[in-house]
Design a protein with these regions (language model features):
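Active-site helical microenvironments for divalent-metal-assisted chemistry
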Residues: 1-138
């Protein structure tokens, strides 16, 4: 099985039964990011970008699936550490050009407030946080 196909299958399984903040099927988010990427490495990392944070998958288990060290380094960079503030996380993402590109696309997708039918105050606060991060990464 090709690595991109394998990555999509893992992402679909990892995000099974998950919904985004707009109530949509979550897997659509990483798929949208994947479609914005240029190289296969970028596409694989984009579709897997939330798998380590949001499922039982780890960088080590993804390594056993045969993903390249480049993809794994991007995924590690895109995974927020337990004791890390959001701002520290964004500063770390800046150091990896591929992770930076994916995180910018992630933030842009997450800032599409029109997907939420009736945005609440918490949605607007989250949007402000994402916008600050987007500006820091641009």
């Amino acid at each position: 099985m090709a690595n991109l196909d394998k990555a999509i299958l893992i992402a679909v399984r990892a995000h099974q039964n998950q919904q985004d903040k707009a109530g949509q099927t979550y897997i659509l988010h990483p798929l949208r990011l994947m479609l914005k990427m240029d190289s296969e490495t970028e596409m694989i990392a984009a579709v897997l970008h939330d798998v380590v944070e949001d499922s039982i998958w780890t960088v080590a288990t993804l390594r056993k699936q045969g993903f390249s060290e480049e993809v794994l380094a991007v995924l590690d960079c895109l995974t927020r550490r337990e004791q890390e503030t959001y701002d520290e996380f964004i500063e770390r993402v800046k150091l990896n050009p591929t992770a930076r590109k994916i995180k910018i696309a992630d933030l842009e997708d997450n800032m599409a407030i029109k997907r939420i039918s009736k945005p609440a105050e918490k949605d607007w606060e989250r949007l402000k946080k994402y916008h600050r991060a987007w500006l820091a990464l641009r």
